[in-house]
């Protein structure tokens, strides 16, 4: 790395590009195929760019301020990114995971200071799972109700419906790919 950074957010996305020479040879390709090694992001999560972008978008809209609590459902990757950036920006994070998610992911989340819940800790979700009425929308609504019921400001970042999640790639991925290749345009 050629520069000194002052916060973890400055490290996001500037991950190495690697030419996939073996793949090119195996498939007799004339074009170069590049892979972006996203696991080199600061938290080790491939979702760091999206997690940071969702937090930045919420801050810009005035939906988050230091001391607030972010809530999200995660299987791990987005949650790990959210945990890293929540900690560095002065937010608390509570994540809800499906039963059976790896202990290692839970430990990483906790190491960043996140509180980890299992989705069935929400009684209405446990009931919906048991009686067969569970849907993703029901779960999203239950998480929003959980946030609304808290005595302090809780913000459901809602990666599934948050435009800043895919927006991270429209806004940033092309830049992070085209700058090191000096092409300006990738096809």
Task: Please provide the spans of the model-predicted regions.
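PLP-dependent amino-acid enzyme catalytic core
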Residues: 1-182
């Amino acid at each position: 790395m050629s520069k000194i950074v002052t916060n973890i957010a400055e490290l996001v996305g500037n991950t190495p590009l690697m030419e996939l020479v073996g793949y090119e040879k195996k498939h007799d390709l004339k074009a170069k195929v590049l892979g972006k090694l996203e696991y080199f992001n600061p938290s080790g999560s491939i979702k760091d760019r999206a997690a940071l972008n969702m937090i930045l978008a919420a801050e810009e809209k005035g939906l988050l301020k230091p001391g607030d609590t972010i809530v999200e459902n995660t299987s791990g990757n987005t949650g790990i990114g959210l945990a890293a950036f929540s900690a560095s920006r002065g937010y608390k994070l509570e994540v809800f995971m499906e039963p059976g998610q790896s202990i290692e992911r839970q430990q990483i989340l906790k190491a960043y200071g996140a509180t980890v819940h299992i989705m069935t800790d929400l009684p209405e979700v446990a009931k919906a799972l048991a009686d067969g009425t569970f849907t993703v929308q029901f779960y999203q609504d239950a998480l929003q109700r959980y946030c609304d019921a808290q005595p302090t400001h809780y913000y459901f970042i809602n990666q599934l419906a948050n435009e800043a999640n895919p927006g991270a790639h429209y806004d940033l991925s092309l830049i992070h790919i085209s700058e090191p290749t000096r092409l300006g345009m990738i096809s």
